[in-house]
Amino acid sequence: NGTRYESATLLCENLEEELKCQARTSMLMGSGAMLNLALDAKANQDKMKTVINWGNNTDVTYGGQLSAVTRFFKTDGKKPILQADIDVLPTQIILNDSVWNIRPSHLALDSGRVFIDNFLVERPNQYLRIDGKVADKETDSCLVNLKNIDVKYVLDIVRFDAVEFSGQATGVVNLKSILKDFTMNTHLNVHNFAENSGLMGEADITGAWDHELGGVRLEAQIEEENLSATHVTGYVSPKLKGLDLMIDADSTSIALLNPYLEGIFSDLNGRVNGFVRLHGPFKALDFEGKVSAAIDAKVDVLNTY
């Protein structure tokens, strides 16, 4: 898949009826940073303990440890099925220099289904909690609960940088039939929502997965109290590698358009009213529309304000 590795080692030993394996590698990230990965596993009879460590080499730290104990067993009958119980152990991870606690939780693997019982990653006044089933039936759902999760963290992890979004998201993501006809519905409130570093206010966002688009159709109402209101509808599609958003602006900060006006204007500040369509492939987004604006800006070609 184009991922580059600097080096890798694998060592396995079978001592005193215990199998030990160690794996080490360094992965080159797109930014040029190096991500170091290490896996240690010990297996004895029907039990295996696994520890995964990782860390980067940049000024901002991303790293940590995942640890779990897995017990394997088979069902009774003529066609026994291999199953597994996984106890996630308490550890810590570091995201953007912030320490997060992974709390004890339980997972079970049964006939191609994964049961998740209260998987929790948290720090003061922030958490991500997962409960439910990863399976192929429409009635099988998995709930992801968020509290004050930084939107930018999530987008950095999935390497989405076509548009810069930020803010602290609280709400629920409902995933169904994950292994077959995947559906997703979400309702999030985002505090201090910003687009392209332009603060837009408090956002109420609903979204649903669209199979044909291979992406999310969304609707958002964003307000700065007694100052502005912005209504957004459209979609973001990883499958099509593009987006199409209709923005109804009422005294909305013009800062959200800054990246698309580079080379024409700079130091752009002010408010806009009207309709803007932001659309196109992620790597070549364009905008069009009709707006009225009260702005201050530097005209680069004239070097004047």
Regions found by a protein language model. Give the residues of each.
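Interface amphipathic segments
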Residues: 1-305
